[in-house]
Amino acid sequence: MDKSQYKNVYVFVEQRDGVVQNVALELLGKARELADALHEQVIALLLGKGVKDKADELIAAGADVVLSIEADELAQYTTEPYAQAITQVIHERKPSILLIGATSIGRDLGPRLSARIGTGLTADCTGLDISEDGDLLMTRPAFGGNLMATIICKEHRPQMSTVRPGVMRAKAADPTRKGKVEDVKINFDKSKFRVRILETVKEQKNMIDITEAKVLVSGGRGVGTAEGFQTLRELADVLGAEVSASRAMVDAGIL
């Protein structure tokens, strides 16, 4: 593989119902740092239907170019249309790096792209940097979080990584930034589509997304009982925080 043909840092922009997800803005901020170190550009992949107007938000967040990929097939996320679209872009544009949020969508999409392209994927990264040789250094927890492993994809491109939400810091939006928006047409092979969305029902729940919280008060087995969590809730109210718990407490049904 001639790695010199592969340039720029690409970010898959996850949007839901036309709303750009925070993890995408966080990845654009990190992509900006990586691209500056490589003297390359940040390219945002904006897939969907009727979402092209989000391009200015992405440019303000750090993108140099927004590839607007609009199609009826992309109106809602399903695996095959999105995988086909991004695979086509990778073959045509040859990105050096592709970053994807480690969300339910990203964890579905990333491995499929990796398999189709024939490159590696480092999942659930908590750190990204550029080596002296210009390779992407991808750091992730290993062995249950007891070790941190730094992984390099030396022989294949693009270098792919999924990144946990809330790990990277989004840059302050700069509305004065200038960028370019390009329309991209995808040639879908609809014979491979296996899933059709018949109806979407949104779950009604009074829960807070703790990844969006600025302060957390968290408890584990030491709290003991549901009554013990009431003390944590009182503390959280004083601090203006949200309450969270360890996996053991959630599995036990205490929270």
Feature map (PLM): residue ranges:
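N-terminal glycine-rich FAD/FM-binding segment characteristic of electron-transfer flavoproteins
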Residues: 1-255
